[in-house]
């Protein structure tokens, strides 16, 4: 938490980091609390910012533009996590390190939120065929179904209310606003995909299972559930065969992963190579430009409609 001092005008100014409970005992009448909220990658960061608004300080442990499958916390990160009030992570196998870290931390004052817990998880169809670095057989990319995104925002809202009950109405109002946006996004996807005659997507890695499941599409991943899985010759041949068989005209790559393999397959099959963003991370440039979960998901929908209409 941060200590805030009041000046004569009643304005609050951030002064320094302190351990919240100690400071609360002595200065309760002089400060307003701003909960510190740590999360693991862009989507969790975005959801926490939306629900927490100006009542929380949200810190994304994963640097902008970093592929989160590869990331692990540093000693400095662990120290900062122990000082926080809430730690948000996706779960479902996305963060391979999280169980060990939570066991090692002094978590008596830390509320941890596994945002995907309770969602019906899809299985990795290739779990027994490929040696993925993901040691889970579950697909963790739940947020690419807008209804799952709404569910995760609700989990975050409940955690914030638990820690900061005084601002319950504020968090409830923010959740209501963004839950409505999730429903509207879901409607856009249903309407946008319902009349498509083609249903097959070739994607950089198998991150789009929940999106495909929600809207009757099919994905063929060049790589597995982890974006850094390298396709072997057999997988490359299967992808090329699939693309030709289904007359796929667009091979999708991602923002945070080299497009080299996708472009190679596109050249081999006479297709275009374009971006489809799984929202595991965004570049600083896009964040500064105001991009968020909803804007990127709408861009994804436009890309899918174009690809499946060719």
Where is each model-derived feature located?
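Extracytoplasmic metal-acquisition and chelation regions
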Residues: 1-310
